[in-house]
UniProtKB/Swiss-Prot annotation:
Protein name (Swiss-Prot/TrEMBL): Tryptophan synthase alpha chain
GO molecular function, a single term: tryptophan synthase activity
Subunit structure: Tetramer of two alpha and two beta chains.
Reaction(s) the record says it catalyses: (1S,2R)-1-C-(indol-3-yl)glycerol 3-phosphate + L-serine = D-glyceraldehyde 3-phosphate + L-tryptophan + H2O
Keywords: Amino-acid biosynthesis, Aromatic amino acid biosynthesis, Lyase, Tryptophan biosynthesis
Originating organism: Legionella pneumophila (strain Corby)
């Protein structure tokens, strides 16, 4: 069984909500990434999302764009990201790792070779931001051959027809984009978010995790009250880079933020 399914089953059995942090591989410097991954697990992460740096990350806001620029300045590419996962797997063979990124670097790598190498390294799935489900058939077949999960995005504006495509191709869970715009956006309106989320939830055969715009432990808990889980990215990356630039400990800073989110989610999650 894929690690993602095992984790989701365990969370369901324990009546807990998923917490998934996103970091960009190689940011702020390559040697920190594996230690960050372990710190986030220690601080309550259920699933790790690791970003593959790309020069034109169209869905990302300025925080993650800058993170990718910093990683690319260290010449971080697909092979480096896979090596980071290999290092992580030496001492953690249970926490799911999802690679999140864009099609171009993987297309250049070669779909079959990438899927083979990713699974061998210990990757469990991918989120390819710019791969529409209607065009995913070829990639989906390759991923299935190697046992790599395809995780798709959906949003308030996703049509019923597209949800059908997603349900045909997706594995594990879906990433629900809570806001129009880019990662790190502001103005999360909870009543509206809840109503739109529940519409998508009714159309989905898989758990639905909410990302984009979750900035505080309180906000994470409020979303977890109705959602299957939350994904936090830009706020976490801000904590990491601010600590690093202030010559403080990024591991401590990221761990403190995630621990507070975990605690807030569990306090509400245990009551639903």
């Amino acid at each position: 069984m894929n690690r993602i399914d095992k984790t989701l089953e365990k969370l369901k059995a324990n009546r807990k909500k998923m917490l998934s942090p996103y970091i960009t591989a190689g940011d702020p410097y390559p040697e920190l990434t594996v230690s960050l991954m372990h710190q986030l697990v220690k601080s309550g992460a259920d699933v790790l999302e690791l970003g593959i740096p790309f020069s034109d990350p169209m869905a990302e806001g300025p925080v993650i764009q800058r993170a990718m620029e910093r990683a690319l300045a260290h010449s971080i590419h697909c092979d480096d990201v896979l090596n980071m996962v290999r290092q992580f797997r030496k001492t953690d063979n249970e926490t799911p790792v999802i690679l999140m990124g864009y099609l171009n670097p993987i297309e250049q790598y070669g779909y079959d070779l990438f899927a083979q190498q990713a699974v061998e390294a210990g990757v469990d799935g991918t989120i390819l931001v710019d791969l529409p489900p209607e065009e995913a058939d070829g990639v989906s077949r390759v991923w299935q051959k190697h046992g790599l999960y395809s995780i798709y995005l959906c949003s308030p504006t996703t049509s019923a027809e597209r949800m059908n495509f997603i349900n045909q191709h997706a594995n594990g869970y879906l990433y629900y984009v809570s806001l129009k715009g880019v990662t790190g956006s502001d103005a999360l309106k909870l009543p509206e978010l809840k109503a739109q989320y529940l519409q998508r939830k009714a159309q989905s055969k898989l758990p639905l995790m909410v990302g984009f715009g979750i900035k505080t432990p309180e906000m994470a808990a409020q979303v977890a009250e109705f959602a299957d889980g939350v994904i936090v990215g830009a706020t976490l990356i801000n904590e990491i880079i601010e600590a690093y630039e202030a010559k403080k400990d990024p591991l401590q800073a990221s761990g403190a933020l995630l621990s507070s989110m975990r605690q807030a989610i569990d306090n509400i999650g245990s009551m639903v």
